[in-house]
Amino acid sequence: MPTQENAATLEAVERFNAAFNSHDVDLVMDTMTQDCVFDNTNPAPDGLRIEGAAEVRVFWEIFFSANPDAHFEVEEIFAFNDRCVVRWIYRKTKDNHPWHLRGVDIFKIRDGKVAEKLAYVKG
């Protein structure tokens, strides 16, 4: 049986995912804390750490502009206390062809918002 905290954590991550798929930067940022941390998957091998809402906002603005059809599909999601793991497929058009990538995000939730989003990919 899911606990109340687990349910709240899942709800926060589901709000983030819906905001991401809407490409609305204001909605995305409404789901994140002011001191949020986002570890992106690029550049390899370790990705780029982006800290603070202002910097994360700039990242999302550039990202959605460069990836107008970006979409995440959740394959599996589970929460434990303030942590959530999402296994996903990221789809977009690349070089005029459908393209996808599989990965995992590890979220930390605080006060109903994303405080950390750590992204990892296959390949």
Write out the residue ranges for each language-model feature.
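Short, low-complexity N-terminal intrinsically disordered segments enriched in polar/charged residues
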Residues: 1-34
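A beta-strand edge to alpha-helix "cap/lid" segment located at domain peripheries
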Residues: 2-8, 24, 57-123
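Alpha-helix C-capping/helix-to-loop hinge sites
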Residues: 16-19, 39, 92
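Hydrophobic residues in well-ordered beta-strands that form the structural core
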Residues: 29, 38-40, 116
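A short gly/proline-enriched turn/hairpin at secondary-structure junctions
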Residues: 37-50, 62-64
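A broad, structural micro-motif
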Residues: 50-51, 72
